[in-house]
Amino acid sequence: MTNYAIILAAGKGTRMTSDLPKVLHKVSGLTMLEHGFRSGKAISPEKSVTVIGHKSKMVRGGLADQSAFVHQTEQLGTGHAVMMAETQLEGLEGHTLVIAGDTPLITGESLKSLIDFHVNHKNVATILTATAQDSFGYGRIVRNKNGEVIKIVEQKDANEYEQQLKEINTGTYVFDNKRLFEALKCITTNNAQGEYYLTDVVAIFRANKEKVGAYILRDFNESLGVNDRVALATAETVMRQRITQKHMVNGVTFHNPETVYIESDVEIAPDVLIEGNVTLKGRTHIGSGTVLTNGTYIVDSEIGQGSIITNSMIESSVLAAGVTVGPYAHLRPGTTLDREVHIGNFVEVKGSHIGEKTKAGHLTYIGNAQVGSSVNVGAGTITVNYDGQNKYETVIGDHAFIGSNSTLIAPLEIGDHALTAAGSTISKTVPIDSIAIGRSRQVTKEGYAKRLAHHPSRSK
């Protein structure tokens, strides 16, 4: 069995009120177009064709080289859009899935069931349908007394009886590929909207006594077509629930799953504990046994097993096992932390590698640095890495001790087991086993404070 897929992505999406094409709006980290394309891969299509139109270059970039593309210059209806794909699929034997690019909730499992149903029943066309409590606005499935599908009627063309029908067209179909394009040559624009309806091919098939069927979705949410921001928010809510439920089934504990945002490509190992208001985005991986406390935000990062991240932000970073971060820490892109590193409250790290068991507990900035293992970085330490034009590197050896309130002016190297005195400004190399002191000598003037205006004795 050879399968093909057509994704309809040419529309502007006026009701979105956006400069961004509708299909490029995101749901749980992926564009609606990407969601549809990924779901369509469940049928293993030999060829996928995406129909583009409005801002076609931008939409094309959303799938890059994963699909063939055809251009619909004028948006003259769904039937006209599918006609554009004939140049790619004409004359091919097999079954063609047609899916709208604005239905992000449709699952691969449902599409696989749809095409299996189509093949097993030897249909020339199979419609994916759903039962709606309120069917207003949807195309209605019209059946005869024997329960056979005889046509699909759009809302504007439906009579009073048809408007009462609850079975609706989801806009997803499977067709015999050759018969699809033959039937499309017979449809007209003789309807309320003056468009070429793809749904009109159903009546054509029936007139030729060809078999048409319908596969009914179990979950109505999958049928959601996103046409405005309200529907986009609904899709986001449903997708978020799906994602958290998937992770819970796989052994992840959530204290308050309704408040957690996890994108589609995030991977979480079993026995992770996630508190409320946690955000996980992009290609993030969380290792087993890790704890993410309230307010943590992680994007495109790898967190090693058994780590504890407390109310902190982590971006494009790699953390080994047993790391502790926070509260209120910020790991910026390019940060690598080895095993059992501790990054404490109000510490910022950027573009740096920090060796195992090193600690930076408080109020510190480490940028463009190579820090060895078992280093103690005292509170208030700053790596001065930027001169207004270029960034420079600081290198700190193993077992070094950086005193509190040290200012390290790069480029700089501090050797193994070296020490900088608290309050020092260090701008020259500190050799192995050395102590560097870079501060003014303290001068104490006894009794002098009594001469100052703030002293209590001055108010008498």
UniProtKB/Swiss-Prot annotation:
UDP-N-acetyl-alpha-D-glucosamine binds at residues 8-11, 22, 72, 77-78, 139, 154, 169, 227, 332, 350, 365, 376. Acetyl-CoA binds at residues 379, 385-386, 404, 422, 439. Its EC number is 2.7.7.23, 2.3.1.157. GO terms for molecular function: glucosamine-1-phosphate N-acetyltransferase activity; magnesium ion binding; UDP-N-acetylglucosamine diphosphorylase activity. This is Bifunctional protein GlmU. Mg(2+) binds at residues 102, 227. The active site is at 362 (proton acceptor). Its cofactor is Mg(2+). Keywords: Acyltransferase, Cell shape, Cell wall biogenesis/degradation, Cytoplasm, Magnesium, Metal-binding, Multifunctional enzyme, Nucleotidyltransferase, Peptidoglycan synthesis, Repeat, Transferase. It comes from the Bacteria. GO terms for cellular component: cytoplasm; membrane. It holds the Pfam family Hexapep. InterPro entries: Bifunctional_GlmU, GlmU-like, GlmU_C_LbH, Hexapep, NTP_transferase_dom, Nucleotide-diphossugar_trans, Trimer_LpxA-like_sf. NCBIfam families: glmU, PRK14354.1. Homotrimer. Residues 251-460 are annotated as: N-acetyltransferase. It catalyses: alpha-D-glucosamine 1-phosphate + acetyl-CoA = N-acetyl-alpha-D-glucosamine 1-phosphate + CoA + H(+); N-acetyl-alpha-D-glucosamine 1-phosphate + UTP + H(+) = UDP-N-acetyl-alpha-D-glucosamine + diphosphate. Pathway: Nucleotide-sugar biosynthesis; UDP-N-acetyl-alpha-D-glucosamine biosynthesis; N-acetyl-alpha-D-glucosamine 1-phosphate from alpha-D-glucosamine 6-phosphate (route II): step 2/2; Nucleotide-sugar biosynthesis; UDP-N-acetyl-alpha-D-glucosamine biosynthesis; UDP-N-acetyl-alpha-D-glucosamine from N-acetyl-alpha-D-glucosamine 1-phosphate: step 1/1; Bacterial outer membrane biogenesis; LPS lipid A biosynthesis.
